[in-house]
Amino acid sequence: GAEIRPSSKFFFMPNCVTNKLSIRGTDNQIEQILSAIAEKEKTDAISRSPIDFNNIIPMPADLNVESGSRGHQGLEYIIGLSKSESREEVCKTWDSLTQEEKDNRLLFGAKYFTNTMRYGFPTWYEWRTQNWGTKWNACNASKSGNIIFFGTAWSTPEPIIKALSVKY
């Protein structure tokens, strides 16, 4: 069968990891894997990334929502889970907000709640770090024959590599 062989090297920047993914097998197996993991959304092959984590472990589209304090504050209000404040105290901090800002917090909070109930995570951020091992998709990717070089934030995307190894 085909063999997936990862290696990682840290960039000079502490946040970035350079990954080298070597794919071994027959020419047909290699082409099948490269085709399966390549970005599909862009139509021209030149700008298309040779690796898209969504083609390996797809993230539910509903999770593609802003990750930030607005949503977490709205969620705390909705379910009353603020660790340090009661619902009333949370609302007091909202006194300086416009009605539109309050509504946005509640909308984000409701979305976070729905996502957590459905997927176990409120946003893309929590889901990706758990399921991909990194917060962003592959970046600055290039391909040379059966080798793909790509960057990731913070760490090697071990769940992605494992999923590829299991599948192929």
Predicted region positions:
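Long, contiguous binding/interaction regions
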Residues: 9-168
